[in-house]
Amino acid sequence: MKKAASIFLRANMTQRDVRLLLQWMENPAVTQYLNEDSTVTTHLRQMECSVPEPMLTYHFNRRSRFFMACTREGEAIGFVKLREQMTGTYEIVYAIGDEALWGRGYGTDAVRSALATAFLKWRAGKVIAKIYPENLRSVRSVGA
């Protein structure tokens, strides 16, 4: 199996990102291990219709820091969210949206990039990931 090329985290959000997120959040295989609010797709649809693109980044970062996980070519393939739980402690939430890309190391690269941001740039003391034990790909991604 072909291994993933390295990825980068992009903070700037676009209308295309909103459409991709909608597609991913409507896929039960993608969301089965996420603890997202049941109204997330409704909220994304409202944003798609009513929020101008220059304001999307602001809206996605109101309660947490939100990034699109992108290939080196710039293709968005997933997302990472870092939500501050208390001063210096963040919760990480991540997903690779395209099932065809699962198991290739993209999730691991996204986690590593997010941890570098949290620990090296923000000087976080701790980052936690709430992972279901049966979510074996995520367990491997964080080295648990």
Provide a role label for each language-model segment.
Residues 23-45:
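Helix-loop element at the rim of GNAT/NAT acetyltransferase active sites that forms part
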Residues 1-27, 66, 70-144:
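Acyl-donor (CoA/ACP) binding surface of acyl/acetyltransferases
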